UniProtKB/Swiss-Prot annotation:
L-leucine binds at residues 374-377, 386, 451. The gene is SESN2. GO terms for molecular function: L-leucine binding; peroxidase activity; protein sequestering activity; protein-containing complex binding. It comes from Pongo abelii (Sumatran orangutan). It is found in: Cytoplasm. This is Sestrin-2. Residues 66-239 are annotated as: N-terminal domain. The modification N-acetylmethionine is found at residue 1. There is a cross-link at residue 175 (Glycyl lysine isopeptide (Lys-Gly) (interchain with G-Cter in ubiquitin)). The modification Phosphoserine is found at residue 249. It comes from the Eukaryota.
Length: 480
């Protein structure tokens, strides 16, 4: 424990230095500032060119959204800048993001930020860990807790198991895990507290996916460098503009790729209109095939395994525990989660509304905002119905978490999602800390960056909903 304390203490200032409103050393030296000046302005993302998002001042984003709380700290953070490329979604996101962290609720404010630290640390997401460390201290949290889980109260430490499962293998959550947290005792959780904690955990796990998926960089350095400005909000008629949606891949070849995708989408939509029925057995067979093929969708073997940082390990129990494919060769797979047996609309939403009424409606609005978001454009084309493509992405994310929709033809996934996109989706959803710039660049090379951010919004929400469904189903079974 002494080693863990010393390692965490040494790293703590470094992370707080990059957090909004953070504390730490006086800032980098003159040599570092000169080097940064030579490089020019740094954007909010390592993947997206700075000129793609820095269009207008931060005030334009706040004015467009009408969110005073966003600017309460006097700055717009990098995550908001990138996500703000889609301000209609960001409005719903911010309401839910703000609610469990800052409004009245069963958990103390400092506890909420500590739970967020625990969640983000599972994916080694230093961006979120640093941000919530600063917020933890600003809300009166005990600095000793930041030396590691062993310094936190036993009640918080009891969340480690369900945090681990929600982050990596939510299908393993059972009513016994819920019972262990709620059973009468000295460090017991109330049901209201647990629901808020589960929303926080799943929110921060999925937000870690967005941070890694979009290459979000730390905020302005501690020497007072200004925070990035916000992007221009898109019009309702078109997707947020890029200088050249084909600039990464060579115009004619990319145009052919887009046209081929458009043709596949058109054929699928026509077959749906003709109601060309597929038997239930065939639908189930196609799901099992897609689930099995997902075993082969993995990052390149030359991707180095990220080395866990000591400051992250302070907040993580069983760090070797990670995502494993829902269906593994030679292993007994858990039963498939049939979405019709426990849906968000009919079961999860009503349970959340009953136990956490402030959050249920906002969660539902956020899921719908991401799923239905469209500008009716693809790359250089406008007037496009993208519903089948968005549905394929959403359902593929749920597929890798073992969730099947009986009324969905999983053959559409293979028709619409190229392999590079599948690799990216699975990496960002399941082990986001392995995401690389190359993965980001390889998929949809002919699409706008804002469209790639849109994919990450679908990833964020589909992943969060999948984990919540497993947790809420376990609570329902515990209560019945």
């Amino acid at each position: 424990m002494i080693v863990a304390d010393s390692e965490c203490r040494a790293e703590l200032k470094d992370y707080l230095r990059f957090a909004p409103g953070g504390v730490g050393d006086s800032g980098p030296g003159e040599e570092q500032r000169e080097s940064r000046a030579r490089r020019g302005p740094r954007g909010p993302s390592a993947f997206i060119p700075v000129e793609e998002v820095l269009r207008e001042g931060a005030e334009s984003l706040e004015q467009h959204l009408g969110l005073e709380a966003l600017m309460s700290s006097g700055r717009v953070d990098n995550l908001a800048v990138v996500m703000g490329l889609h301000p209609d979604y960001f409005t719903s996101f911010w309401r839910l993001h703000y609610l469990p962290l800052h409004t009245d609720g069963p958990l103390a404010s400092s506890w909420r930020h500590y739970i967020a630290i625990m969640a983000a640390a599972r994916h080694q997401c230093s961006y979120l860990v640093g941000s919530h460390m600063a917020e933890f201290l600003q809300t009166g949290g005990d600095p000793e807790w930041l030396l590691g889980l062993h310094r936190a109260p036993e009640k918080l430490r009891k969340l480690s198991e369900i945090n681990k499962l929600l982050a990596h293998r939510p299908w393993l959550i059972t009513k016994e895990h819920i019972q262990a947290l709620l059973k009468t005792g000295e460090h017991t959780w109330s049901l209201a507290e647990l629901i808020q904690a589960l929303v926080l955990l799943t929110h921060c796990h999925s937000l870690s996916s967005f941070v890694f998926g979009c290459g979000i960089l730390p905020e302005g350095d501690a020497d007072g460098s200004p925070a990035p400005q916000a992007p221009t909000p898109p019009s309702e008629q078109s997707s947020p503009p890029s200088r050249d949606p084909l600039n990464n891949s060579g115009g004619f070849e990319s145009a052919r790729d887009v046209e081929a995708l458009m043709e596949r989408m058109r054929q699928l939509q026509e077959s749906l209109l003709r109601d060309e029925g597929t038997s239930q057995e065939e639908m189930e067979s196609r799901f099992e095939l897609e689930k099995s093929e997902s075993l082969l969708v993995t990052p390149s073997a030359d991707i180095l395994e990220p080395s866990p940082h000591p400051d992250m390990l302070c907040f993580v129990e069983d760090p070797a525990f990670g995502y494993e494919d829902f269906t593994r060769r030679g292993a007994q797979a858990p039963p498939t989660f049939r979405a019709q047996d426990y849906t968000w609309e009919d079961h999860g939403y009503s349970l959340i509304q009953r136990l956490y009424p402030e959050g249920g409606q906002l969660l539902d609005e956020k899921f719908q905002a991401a799923y239905s978001l469209t500008y009716n454009t693809i790359a250089m084309l406008s007037g496009v119905d993208t519903s089948v493509l968005r549905r394929a992405i959403w359902n593929y994310i749920h597929c890798v978490f073992g969730i099947r929709y009986d009324d969905y033809d999983y053959g559409e996934v293979n028709q619409l999602l190229e392999r590079n996109l599948k690799v990216y989706i699975k990496t960002v959803a399941c082990y986001p800390e392995k995401t690389t710039r190359r993965m980001y660049n390889l998929f949809w090379r002919h699409f706008r960056h804002s469209e790639k951010v849109h994919v990450n919004l679908l990833l964020l929400e589909a992943r969060m909903q999948a984990a919540l469904l497993y947790a809420l189903r376990a609570i329902t079974r515990y209560m019945t």
